[in-house]
Amino acid sequence: MSCLFVISAPSGAGKTSVIRTLLQTDINLTLSISYTTRPPRRDEKNGHDYFFVDHATFKDMQARGEFLESAEVHGNLYGTSRKWIEETMAAEQDVLLEIDCQGAQQIRTVYPQAASIFILPPSMEALKQRLEQRGQDENKVIERRLAAARSEISHVNRFDYVVVNHELETAARDVASIVQAERLKTIRQLVRQRSLIAEFS
């Protein structure tokens, strides 16, 4: 029985860095690559970071029901491939979704057993500094992201776990601990260790 993990955070909280660190040490975890209409950033590659598509293509895919979840974030559309998730989990591979709060709630509706993790920045000031240091956005865009962060953080009680990203390595270890604990839950071990348990019955 495979596990599905959902990680959400405000823009600038460091979730992408946490996930990259986690994936370097956990070969049994596969990151779902989302579709998006936003332009790629300087260091992003199509098919690796996102599948970059135009608005019309995204809307066509959405109309055909190809997305397990989709949402508009900061004026851009994002979606998760339904077929890819179903096939990967059917192959007994654990899946990690890096999505916004809207998408996280949609996923929980379809997969109530999914483990949801919210990554908090250590403070609003720290979040602002991180957004400024990225050098990607104008001041008005940063202010809009900070306002969105307040709204997103107000929904933190809907998540199973909360990790504060004071320091990258520590936050990544915290998330890794959550992943391991979920894998060891009885409902999953009864399936994975079926033959072992049968020896004692």
Swiss-Prot record:
The keyword Transferase applies. Pfam families: Guanylate_kin (PF00625). It comes from the Bacteria. Its main location: cytoplasm. GO terms for molecular function: ATP binding; guanylate kinase activity. InterPro entries: GK/Ca_channel_bsu, Guanylate_kin-like_dom, Guanylate_kinase, Guanylate_kinase_CS, P-loop_NTPase. One of its GO terms (cellular component) is cytosol. Residues 2-180 form the Guanylate kinase-like domain. Its EC number is 2.7.4.8. SMART domains: GuKc. ATP binds at A9, P10, S11, G12, A13, G14, K15, T16. NCBIfam families: guanyl_kin. This is Guanylate kinase. The lineage of its organism: Bacteria, Pseudomonadati, Pseudomonadota, Betaproteobacteria, Nitrosomonadales.
